[in-house]
Amino acid sequence: MARLAEKNNLLKPLILSNDVKYMAQNANTRNNIYPNIDVTDDDPENWDYTFNIEKKNFYTYYASKDRVNPSKKIVETLNKETDPKIILQYLKKINKLEDYSDTEALGILTIDNKINTQGNFGYRPINLVYNIDESTVLKIKENIKKTSGIAVNTIPIRSYPNRYVASHILGYMGPIATEAEIEKYVKKRDYLRDEIIGKAGIEESYQDNLKGKNGKSLVTVDSSGNRKETISKSPSEPGDDLYLSIDLDLQEQAEKSLAGVLDAIRNGHAYESEYGLFMPIRRAAYAESGAVVVSDVKTGQVLAMASLPNYDPNLFATGISQSDWESLQVEEDSGPLVPRPMLNIASQTAVVPGSTFKLVSSLAALEKGLDPQAINTCHGFLDIGNRRFNCLIWTEKGTTHGEENLYGAIRDSCNYFFYCLALGENPGDGRSVGVKLELNDIRIAAEKLGLDKPTGIEINIPKEATGNIPSINKKIEVTRLMLKNYLEKELPLHLKNDVKKSKSEFENDVVDIVNFTDDPESWTRKKILDFLDERGYDPERILEGKRAGLADTIKYTYLNQAVWDITDMLNIVIGQGQNSYTPIQMNRAIATLTNGGYLYKYTLVDKVTNHDSQDVLFNNVPEGNRIDLKDRKYLEDIKYGALLVAQNNKILSQLPVEIGIKTGTAEVEGENADGVKYDSYAWMVGFAPYDDPEIAISIVLTQGDTSYNASAIMRDIVAKYFDLDVYTTNTGDTKANVDRGQIGDNPTREIGDIIENLNPNDLKKEKQNNGAN
């Protein structure tokens, strides 16, 4: 048949018929088929970025309205102009908008441009503004005719009645914007180009479930794309209902307690909740952010995940304004610890865990054969070469813990005990401790507890961070990167006065020096001095504000760190060094240690149901496996040590429910914007109740100074979950008498005033001074 049509010259006219072309194009569109444009014969030099093309089209459109100057010349001039005010004034002039303010004119031009870019799709409505009030609606109806093409419609918009609560879980909405979103939603899922979609969090992950189906109107249009007649309509359909695992009351408590404690320790006043009073021992002047995670240890369901600062997702419901977006951002060079509202600390920030990691080291030691009852004497400190490693009790009081077994070492957070596990012996008396922990032992234990991978929560954007289990290769990689960054910034400053170098010469020198790390021990101080001198640098000049010259910095700060030695293990077993994990990863590790050894995939979703029928479309079933252990009693040994820690905490020991906790204080390098060194991260992890754990809790306070500061948050979470009638205080605790294991694990930096003598009776006055009701 085809050959017969071709022979009689019928095929080509049929294919090229406008009616047939329209039918084919319509069929393609209905089936979501968008034929690719063949550009293989085009010269790549003629290609341009979409943004540049759109800008040129914008200028060309408005240049055509200028009746005096040639369009081509206007476009060239506008493209070169960098001052947006000058461009706006020109556009106001040719559009006869000079009597309007810049803001009004910009609004008019924006609407005009939106209409122009519709092209042949003029029948598709353009959303000009959302959430207008009733008075505006009345003005539109009174002053604008129905035939003008402008109408007020009611459309569903996402509303978040609890505003900031769980914002990092829910995520936010926004219009389709990126090329990836156009490909994913417009081309593959038949979305309209200007639809609002989930951009982050659960909103993004479950976009297809939550969206439902758009209503449709079949219309006829004229040659300009204007709607002439509506042939048929089909109503929109609501999306599915999604139920989270989050306990709203617990989530609100976590956020409220986190905010209250951060404010109290930052400003040096008491924190009070319905469950008690907390008096900070000292100020933590830079404590402005933190996170709390609460999970069901028997299912892996996340019951609460708080991160501060947070944001109001209502700002994004119809597309966020530029000013609101900018208010949520921070300067790029403001430092890694500056509070960031858009950052979910709970799942995105992997930090050093401090002594909370001693529970992981304990599991590794027990698996290797440690007798938890065996006595090991703490001597306060030990020396490795010219470096001293202390227990905090020695640093602050000049005393020791004396005889310790594993339970006591966990309770007292005894660094010395864990140092001995890494050494295989007690250097104070030369006695063997029965086991010697190697790096691989730590790695195996950490991997069993899931610290090498994400927890599995259903948030694709922003992606959940993966922590870092220490390794020799990673240490060398990190050292090389740090040395490279240092040299790129500092090397030119050490150039001799009579020497000049090009950028490429500096780059070659940086590469050569970084390669010293391939064999760091062969690069003696003298060899480095000679190398730098030969390359035209002053190797011993100490710049203002620095403590060492170029050669000594390269040798002792970087090259010495490129060699793995026993001091690395001493840091790792107490949770320092290369260890870094997110709060939700640490939460899963604690849950696994206390639920009988089950490592669950974490989830934020309980179920998905059909909106109309309420039929269950998806019901979340716990996913987990039991980790391999030589003896499950090891888990009870670790739990018991954590119980002793809680019993030593004045606030938590008053609870009617027995719980287990582990504290941690982790040092971090760097400075705040005012030049003051970063304060420590404050950690606390725990579980409750002790006998048959139901929940795991992890808390981290950025620059929180001491883990003791997390006590009130832990109390509030436990009390809220178990609906306890309790009011506990730490009145009487001072810096002098509080248990060392509760204060922290590292020498602390004094920031701000000692506030231990603050009178609890002044609480009401403090609240009044801080604007509380």
Task: Identify the meaning behind each predicted range.
Residues 755-773:
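Long, low-complexity, intrinsically disordered segments
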Residues 372-410, 456-535, 539-553, 559-560, ...:
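Conserved active-site-proximal loop/helix segments of enzymes involved in bacterial cell-wall
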Residues 155, 159-161, 166-167, 171-181, ...:
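Active-site beta-strand/loop architecture of penicillin-binding DD-peptidases
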Residues 122-130, 155, 191-193, 237-246, ...:
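Second-shell loop/turn segments in exported
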Residues 310-334:
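A short, polar/charged loop-to-alpha-helix boundary motif
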Residues 301-302, 599:
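Hydrophobic "anchor" residues
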Residues 1, 140, 169, 253-257, ...:
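Active-site SXXK
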Residues 1-239, 243, 248-291, 297, ...:
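Membrane-proximal periplasmic segments of bacterial cell-envelope enzymes
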